[in-house]
């Protein structure tokens, strides 16, 4: 199923579920990964889905196509990215979990990034939501990962210093039939 932003979408905070929500106006609701303690005061006033939200939606949607995720997972990642960029409180970097690299990469909004866990050298895929001069707010762009005993799930937020981030390399495999 493909979702498409429209003027009837509404942001609101749901007390019962303790989550930021998006009413998709067609009987569907999106429940974000973010609870009250993670949200700015603006999140507690219902508001419409604006033109800037729609522009970011399409930008994130396009940039997320290269992630090895299902359509449903990509939609969830994109909508969580919108919540994060609009309503998430500032976070402190948690970079000590990741390997530092010699060079500093400055990512852009929507870039696919990778980091490597310090303890296992496992690669972790991220979506850059809010880049900064020294660190970037990212969302986990894979179904899950365990970092220092804590399980993170698709769409969870983490801020990481730029010297830990690297651009994600996308390897596309093609069959002989596709090449001909």
UniProtKB/Swiss-Prot annotation:
Residue spans crossing the bilayer: none
Keywords: Cell cycle, Cell division, Cytoplasm, Septation
Keyword Protein transport tagged: no
Keyword Kinase attributed: no
InterPro entries documented for this protein: ZapC, ZapC_C, ZapC_N
One GO process term, biological-process aspect: division septum assembly
Subcellular location(s) per record: Cytoplasm
Gene Ontology, cellular component aspect: cytoplasm
HAMAP family per record: ZapC
Family: Belongs to the ZapC family.
Function: Contributes to the efficiency of the cell division process by stabilizing the polymeric form of the cell division protein FtsZ. Acts by promoting interactions between FtsZ protofilaments and suppressing the GTPase activity of FtsZ.
Subunit structure: Interacts directly with FtsZ.
Protein name: Cell division protein ZapC
Species assigned in the record: Salmonella typhimurium (strain LT2 / SGSC1412 / ATCC 700720)
């Amino acid at each position: 199923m493909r979702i498409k932003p429209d003027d009837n979408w509404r942001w609101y905070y749901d007390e019962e579920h303790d989550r930021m929500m998006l009413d998709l106006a067609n009987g569907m609701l999106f429940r974000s990964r973010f609870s009250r303690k993670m949200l700015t005061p603006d999140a507690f006033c219902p508001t419409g889905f604006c033109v800037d939200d729609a522009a970011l939606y399409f930008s994130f949607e396009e940039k997320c196509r290269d992630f090895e995720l299902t359509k449903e997972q990509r939609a969830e990642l994109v909508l969580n990215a919108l919540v994060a960029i609009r309503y998430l409180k500032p976070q402190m970097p948690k970079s000590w979990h990741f390997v530092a690299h010699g060079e500093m990469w400055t990512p852009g909004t929507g870039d696919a990034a990778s980091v490597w866990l310090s303890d296992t050298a496992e690669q972790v895929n991220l979506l850059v939501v809010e880049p900064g001069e020294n660190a970037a707010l990212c969302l986990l762009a894979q179904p899950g990962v365990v970092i220092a005993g804590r399980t993170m799930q698709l769409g969870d937020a983490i801020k990481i210093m730029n010297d830990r981030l690297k651009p994600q390399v996308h390897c596309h495999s093609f069959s002989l039939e596709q090449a001909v």
